[in-house]
Regions:
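N-terminal beta-strand/alpha-helix entry module and adjacent surface
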Residues: 1-117, 123-162
Length: 162
């Protein structure tokens, strides 16, 4: 499938690249930028709002590009974290079994991409729940450019955290 490129190029320090039309920039311009492919954004929202009463999660796949002046995170793919039936009452978790399945799917469907963060979708995010998600992020996705994308299906709010 041919990928249509924008005619305008973004120049960042010494990093010059053409952005495909199917990417959208998230957040305010600054030294760190997040770009997400429309496919990935649409897939996350379809998962989140298909059963908005359920807690769901997955990993974000892509790449990080750096220059002297800025860092850009490109999200190109998503893999859902499928929690086994007997563990669904625990809510969102990332244990060894779940990671094994995620890495098997990455190898099969996205072998050229790396884990660049994760998403969580749930109805309502209390302060206590947010602290749990933040700890989950630090335990499983620590690193300079790893992002957390939270979808509050009750309030229909979506936020990226770097």
């Amino acid at each position: 499938m041919a990928e249509e490129k924008r005619s305008d190029q973004k120049k960042t320090g010494e990093l010059t690249r053409s952005l495909p039309r199917n990417y959208r920039q998230i957040g305010e311009p600054g030294a760190k930028k997040i770009y997400i492919e429309d496919y990935a954004f649409t897939y996350i929202n379809s998962v989140a709002y298909q059963t908005p009463e359920d807690e769901q999660a997955g990993v974000l796949l892509g790449e990080v590009q750096k220059s002297d002046e800025e860092k850009c995170l490109f999200i190109k793919g998503v893999i859902r974290a499928k929690t086994p039936e007997n563990e669904t009452k625990q809510g969102i978790i990332f244990n060894e079994k779940i990671w094994e399945k995620i890495y098997a799917e990455i190898e099969k469907f996205f072998p050229d991409l790396e884990v660049v963060g994760w998403f969580a979708a749930m109805p309502g995010i209390t302060q206590e729940r947010f602290l749990y998600l933040k700890k989950l992020h630090m335990d499983n996705f620590s690193g300079g450019m790893k992002t957390m994308y939270l979808v509050n299906t009750c309030d229909k709010e979506e936020n990226f955290y770097l």
